[in-house]
């Protein structure tokens, strides 16, 4: 997480808002451990050449394929996306994370996520052209449920995922319709799901930026504070925090399989080209 304190003027009142790119929003590995000592008698010298801090050299090498981890890229991106914040409506920025959004069709998408005093901002950012292309704004006082747990799929699903995620749900009176659930391009689904970035923990400089636990802790704190200061009708009980399976209703999952295997939701090099 990056801690920021900055803001820019603008206006808006929708609990959830989708902004397209260009829309006006207002003015303006070293060694370590025992491997670092001198080799003992009869010990092959080459054993001391492997730094113990590198548990997965292949994964560490792959981090270079992601544009976001190139020197100065994440710093520039964070600096630029501050302009999407509406100080009157959103308040100050509390933190920024680099996470992976998993949509209702199990597609992975690289996202910059901001938590402000009053809003959750989900930014689609192109780390190649260094442009913010889209922003989804969710009012924190509209969040009714935050769930954390392992992913769950229908028994006969052909494309499942392992691991843990966090799901943020809002507008409990408007659960996804049948059409929204089965439309892979729907933007009206009233929840979002995040997992850690696939390269989380590889780059020590950005490790805290990708931590899901830190994001969850600050999100819960920010939602409770926003609901206490600006409660909505029907939210008297506060946000519901659950530890439970996160259901993704995909069966064949061919589209998400292709998307996730090829990492199409990430800005990264692909052979001699990058997209």
UniProtKB/Swiss-Prot annotation:
Domain of life, per the record?
Eukaryota
- UniProt-annotated stretches for the region Disordered: 21-42
Which residue stretches, if any, does this entry annotate as coiled coil?
none
Which residues are annotated as modified residue Phosphoserine in the UniProt record?
A: 10, 14
Instruction: Kindly list the places in or outside the cell where this protein is found, as annotated in its UniProt entry.
Output: Cytoplasmic vesicle, Secretory vesicle, Synaptic vesicle membrane; Presynaptic active zone
Q: How does it sit in the membrane?
A: Peripheral membrane protein
PROSITE patterns registered for this protein in UniProt: HSAC2
**Disulphide bonds in the chain:** none
Keyword terms of this UniProt record: Cell projection, Cytoplasmic vesicle, Membrane, Phosphoprotein, Synapse
* GO annotation, biological process: regulation of synaptic transmission, glutamatergic
According to the UniProt entry, which residues carry Phosphothreonine?
43
Give the region (Important for homomultimer formation and localization to presynaptic regions) as residue ranges: 61-100
Region annotation (Important for homomultimer formation) maps to 189-275
Ranges annotated as biased composition (Gly residues)? 25-40
Q: Which Pfam families match?
A: hSac2
Q: Ranges for the hSac2 domain? A: 68-240
- Modification(s) after translation: Phosphorylated. Phosphorylation promotes association with synaptic vesicle membranes.
Under the cellular component aspect of Gene Ontology, which terms does the record hold? calyx of Held; cytoplasm; presynaptic active zone; synaptic vesicle; synaptic vesicle membrane
Quaternary state and interactors: Forms homomultimers. Multimerization appears to be important for presynaptic targeting. Interacts with BSN.
Reported function: Presynaptic protein involved in the synaptic transmission tuning. Regulates synaptic release probability by decreasing the calcium sensitivity of release.
Give the family this protein belongs to, as stated in its UniProt record: Belongs to the TPRG1 family.
List the protein's name: Tumor protein p63-regulated gene 1-like protein
The protein's organism comes out as: Bos taurus
Q: What gene does the UniProt entry assign to this protein?
A: TPRG1L
């Amino acid at each position: 997480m990056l801690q920021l304190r900055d803001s820019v003027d603008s206006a808006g009142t929708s609990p959830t808002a989708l902004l397209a790119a260009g829309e006006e929003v207002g003015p303006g590995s070293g060694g370590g451990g025992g491997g670092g000592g001198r080799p003992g008698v009869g010990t092959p010298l080459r054993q001391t050449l492997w730094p113990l801090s590198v548990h997965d050299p292949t994964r560490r090498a792959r981090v270079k394929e992601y544009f976001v981890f190139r020197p100065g890229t994440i710093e520039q991106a964070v600096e630029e996306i501050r302009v999407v914040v509406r100080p009157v409506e959103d308040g100050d920025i509390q933190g920024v994370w680099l996470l992976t959004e998993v949509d209702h069709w199990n597609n992975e998408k690289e996202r910059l996520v901001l938590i402000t005093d009053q809003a959750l901002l989900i930014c689609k950012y192109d780390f190649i052209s260094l442009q913010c292309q889209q922003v989804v704004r969710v009012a924190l006082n509209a969040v009714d449920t935050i769930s954390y747990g392992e992913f769950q799929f229908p028994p006969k699903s052909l494309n499942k995922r392992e691991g843990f995620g966090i799901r943020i749900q809002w507008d409990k009176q408007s659960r996804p319709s049948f059409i929204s659930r089965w439309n892979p391009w729907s933007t009206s689904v009233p929840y979002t799901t995040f997992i850690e970035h696939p390269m989380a923990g590889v780059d020590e400089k950005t490790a805290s930026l990708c931590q899901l636990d830190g994001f969850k802790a600050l999100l819960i704190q920010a939602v409770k504070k926003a609901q206490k200061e600006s409660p909505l009708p029907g939210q008297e009980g506060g946000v519901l925090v659950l530890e439970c399976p996160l259901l993704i209703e995909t069966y064949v999952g061919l589209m998400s399989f292709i998307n996730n295997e090829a990492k199409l939701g990430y800005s990264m090099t692909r052979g001699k080209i990058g997209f």
